[in-house]
Regions:
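Short glycine-rich, low-complexity segments
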Residues: 1-33, 54-86
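Beta-strand secondary-structure signal
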Residues: 21-23, 37, 49
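Short, conserved beta-turn/loop elements at beta-strand boundaries and strand-helix junctions
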Residues: 42-48
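SH3/SH3-like beta-barrel fold
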Residues: 48-54
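Short beta-strand-centered aromatic/proline hotspots
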Residues: 34-41
């Protein structure tokens, strides 16, 4: 998948159903989420904004499309392998 394809698919999710599930593994800033419900809050030319609920607080952060390309961020709805959360 190319960056352009990733941008188009994320834009489509944002327009149709922004409630998604993500896997994130980043060291800077330190974020680890597995099959975590999230909401796409914004889509911009080089980044997109996500919100997750953690410890009864909403955390908002921005990710680059490259993060999806290098698999630092996985949007489960893009891969088509939704797993039920335990």
């Amino acid at each position: 998948m190319t960056l352009t394809e990733i941008k188009i698919k994320i834009q489509k999710l944002y327009n149709t159903n922004p409630e998604i599930h993500i896997n994130v593994h980043c060291n800077h800033p330190k974020m680890y989420y597995d099959n975590e419900p999230a909401i796409i809050r914004g889509v911009y030319p080089h980044i997109f904004q996500l919100e997750v609920k953690e410890d009864n607080q909403i955390k908002s952060f921005y990710m680059q499309y490259e993060d999806v390309l290098i698999k630092r961020v996985e949007i489960i709805e893009l891969t088509g392998s939704i797993q039920p959360s335990i």
